[in-house]
Amino acid sequence: MMDRVAGVHYNVGVFTNLSPDHIGPGEHKTFEEYRSWKGQLFKRCDVGVVNIDDENTEALLEGHTCRLVTYGRAEQADYRETGFELLRTHDFLGVKFHVTGKDEMDVKVNMPGEFSVYNALAALAVGKVLGLPDQAIHDGLGKCVVKGRVELVPISKKFTILLDYAHNEVSTESLLTTLRAYKPHRLVVVFGCGGNRSKLRRYGMGEICAKMADFSILTEDNNRFEKVEDILADIRVGMNKGNPDAKFVEIPDRLDALHY
């Protein structure tokens, strides 16, 4: 939309998934426009590595000019995941799975959930496109951690703390669905929403947390030029919609919220 990468050509472009976001004043008018701009990447790269399972893949790739390499769970995927298994200890959440298709490999990733499987498949496919040896790909995936993405914060063996960037309804639902799969005794979420951004994020995140968390702590998160109290009020609307009986507290000061 702002042509920030105009004139830049890429060796490899990657499509992971897409859902409604960045729609509103100063951003995109519609989801279709948002998707169309995302698709421009595949007119500016030599190879496109794409998630064949995502419902938006076909529309996003309309008019693409690159060679495509696919990954996912569909039988026709070039790199296909099978045998997905959750891994857990007191200080570790991860996954392991088997890859078939153009290559065979057992993969272990030090990050939890289904989305980590898809991200690992994408990274594996990019590695193959770039000609990396299988052992380097295997070892790299086994060591990979991403700051702020389901990042484990080792504080106590009595409970597990994870730090994640989830900032809209879809990413929050994906995260909490992932954590629920590990059957936690109690799931507590501390979160807020950014100011001067679409209110749909606030309603959506509030609704999902009300449905999926055992307890939520609503707090500030870069309010920009809005009042924190106004943002929390919008989140509360979503909470009440998701579950009128949801248990939560509002603590505007983030440090106080973390101490709570």
Model-derived regions: residue spans:
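Active-site flanking residues adjacent to catalytic metal/cofactor-binding acidic residues
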Residues: 50, 163, 191, 220, ...
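C-terminal helical cap/extension that packs against the catalytic core
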Residues: 206-260
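Beta-strand->loop->alpha-helix junctions that form or flank phosphate-binding loops
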Residues: 66-90, 108-114, 138-142, 251-252
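Residue-level signal for inorganic ion chemistry
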Residues: 16, 34, 49, 68, ...
